[in-house]
Swiss-Prot record:
One of its GO terms (molecular function) is peptidase activity. Component of the 20S core proteasome complex involved in the proteolytic degradation of most intracellular proteins. This complex plays numerous essential roles within the cell by associating with different regulatory particles. Associated with two 19S regulatory particles, forms the 26S proteasome and thus participates in the ATP-dependent degradation of ubiquitinated proteins. The active site is at T60 (nucleophile). InterPro entries: Ntn_hydrolases_N (IPR029055), Pept_T1A_subB (IPR000243), Proteasome_bsu_CS (IPR016050), Proteasome_sua/b (IPR001353), Proteasome_suB-type (IPR023333). Residues 1-59 form a propeptide. It is found in: Cytoplasm; Nucleus. This is Proteasome subunit beta type-5. Its EC number is 3.4.25.1.
Amino acid sequence: MALASVLQRPMPVNQHGFFGLGGRADLLDLGPGSPGDGLSLAAPSWGVPEEPRIEMLHGTTTLAFKFQHGVIVAADSRATAGPYIASQTVKKVIEINPYLLGTMAGGAADCSFWERLLARQCRIYELRNKERISVAAASKLLANMVYQYKGMGLSMGTMICGWDKRGPGLYYVDSEGNRISGTAFSVGSGSVYAFGVMDRGYSYDLQVEEAYDLARRAIYQATYRDAYSGGAVNLYHVREDGWIRVSSDNVADLHDKYTSSIP
């Protein structure tokens, strides 16, 4: 009954023709000690619940932006469950292939599953077409997959970042099937603080070290103001020859660095 209460669909009991038994549950022998009505164990048909019964607790800060030397991707590493810190070492940048990265914001299971599935589909595309999938095609593929489950409780807000024949690419995709191309995005509970830093310091003409520092500072500022973000700042750089992991800096060390520079 726990599953039925979540899905809010009645369990099929002794329906005519169910499992081809013509409503005769006595023909289904589950052995000694089994419930009298074995058909009550069957899962209900798929349906959309009227209202979610499981509260999704999440918080994070991720960002990505394009500049003249590629795409910068950064994220914190804290995982929370309501007021509790579940982990300080979560990897929120998912490596799809050597030229594509995805970020994780929302439900960790949803993001991890769908982006791993995307990685599989991208590999199949490469084997069939003998060429690397474009960033636009990869993001569209993900948007199409999750759109089929719109309204069913998925929680995912991701950025697909990469480099293809057209140059650096950056797309935002969420669990509602939305897909947006842009030059800079930040997703998560701390994104408002990260955007404040990015809006002030972002320029397409940034040098590499300037871009690194901007991303670190934006994530640090979000962790300083948002209780659901923290841990370490994981920084990646997507270049023409593929992505590299630049650094992983503890936010406590960044706090000492940035506060000591204030007069």
